[in-house]
């Protein structure tokens, strides 16, 4: 019986979680869940100068925001010194390691590989050959393990069956394969994801607009949109699907055989497109809750869902909400309606004012009934519906187009809507 899948995500707490790391975490998550296996979180914090606990905390927060849950961990390499020392001792006893001065003149433990090259198998690339491996440090002079040694020891101890990571680790994998063989332990299955490139074909960086996961979160991206887009950077659905509602659907649709080794190109506009699509699918209650932190003033009490429905179609980011809602709730220039449109605008505004006064709509259905009554009024007088509704829109918002009028009326409330209509009528009389 084949061993159950055990995968891991192993970030270094030297900064925030970036897109490449988030994709690696996602693909490990999908792989483990697809196979009914377990996913471990390991913090590779052996770099004492650069590793910070606050970075670790931020990485954990961002993984939680993405919805990526782990079955074990976090394990911290900085807390496992005795384990690494024990494995180094085995290599020393077997003549496969030795102590010598490092570049700083202090004593360190070096691995002496029995072979200077060889090959390992990659799930996407097949056989990968390597060579020219020199003796390298496995225990640094401060007692901390070097990256390649710690990774191998931990993957052995944690019974990792599959190592899924970025292509940039291919040079490390050759060294790690030699360590596995020296320790007499079978290697896990390796799978190296293709690089993520910018739109110009160069390695992805901040100059392409790429940010940390936290940066996207603070800008107003949804976790499900970011996950959706990241899943497509190196993977294709068998039927060409590109939109997925969230992790649960991605797990259900995941097919590891559709992973590719070619570089993927990051397109900021494509990510923005996915975010807008996911925003449109959100339930109004959740959307209102997510929008609130981006606003200086709270949404109108009792009309929170109407407010977000009013701007939903124009939202691309949660951070767009203040600007879009400000156009509706902010002050309107009374002169905006003066002189446009010509014809019976003043008469139409008077009719709208009377209807508001008599009906005082509080809900969407009542607002729709008011607008239907205004259309009937226009039809009885041989006026096109648009010629009656457009002056009302301009009076309420100062703009020629925008959200559906029923949302605007309910969002403003009958009193404010009435005031805006009266100010527009007065402005027309003065024009």
From Swiss-Prot:
Swiss-Prot/TrEMBL keywords: Aminoacyl-tRNA synthetase, ATP-binding, Cytoplasm, Ligase, Nucleotide-binding, Protein biosynthesis
Enumerate the catalysed reactions: tRNA(Glu) + L-glutamate + ATP = L-glutamyl-tRNA(Glu) + AMP + diphosphate
Report which superkingdom the organism of origin falls in.
Bacteria
Q: Where does ATP bind?
A: 206
> Would the keyword Electron transport turn up in this protein's UniProt record?
no
- EC identifiers of the protein: 6.1.1.17
Biological process annotations from GO? glutamyl-tRNA aminoacylation
Q: Where in the cell is it found?
A: Cytoplasm
* HAMAP family named in the record: Glu_tRNA_synth_type1 (MF_00022)
The protein's matches in PANTHER family, at most eight in alphabetical order, are given as: GLUTAMATE--TRNA LIGASE, GLUTAMATE--TRNA LIGASE, MITOCHONDRIAL-RELATED
Q: Whom does it interact with, and what assembly results?
A: Monomer.
Role summary: Catalyzes the attachment of glutamate to tRNA(Glu) in a two-step reaction: glutamate is first activated by ATP to form Glu-AMP and then transferred to the acceptor end of tRNA(Glu).
Q: From the Swiss-Prot or TrEMBL record, give the protein name.
A: Glutamate--tRNA ligase 1
User: What is the source species?
Assistant: Rubrobacter xylanophilus (strain DSM 9941 / JCM 11954 / NBRC 16129 / PRD-1)
